[in-house]
Amino acid sequence: MNEVEVDHKIYQMPPRDGFSVAHFITVADVERSARFYEKIFGGRILTLGNNEGAPGFIQIANTWLIVYFGGGPTADKPTVTLSVPADPDRVSSFMNIRVADIHACYELWRSRGAEFITEPKKKYGETRCYIRDPDGYIIEVGQTDPGITYG
């Protein structure tokens, strides 16, 4: 394991007690998306899923990503339809990955096929860049400047 790889610890999904946070994205092809997150970020596919109703679950570092093909309203969300982004340049939310060495991550993930919008740029106390996934979602990759801590 090198400095940009993540050691997959045991994080329970579903949690045995309390709760955990998972990020859900609507995708055009469940397997394609699961394989992308596995290849680029070293994610561990817990359940591959399919386009016939089974979501995919991928562990990435200390969180989970759920990929699913979407669909129309259901009994528990009667007015909501899930769909992939119509315009990948207009977003309302995105995944944010915090890293210890952005330049090493940029080079590694680019070598694995990640499509970066730009190279890393300094802004607001951090250096960051963005990746597009196969459905057009953007993923921010950021490294906080030395000396800044949260929490």
Sequence positions of predicted segments:
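Vicinal oxygen chelate
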Residues: 1-22, 44-97, 104-132, 144-151
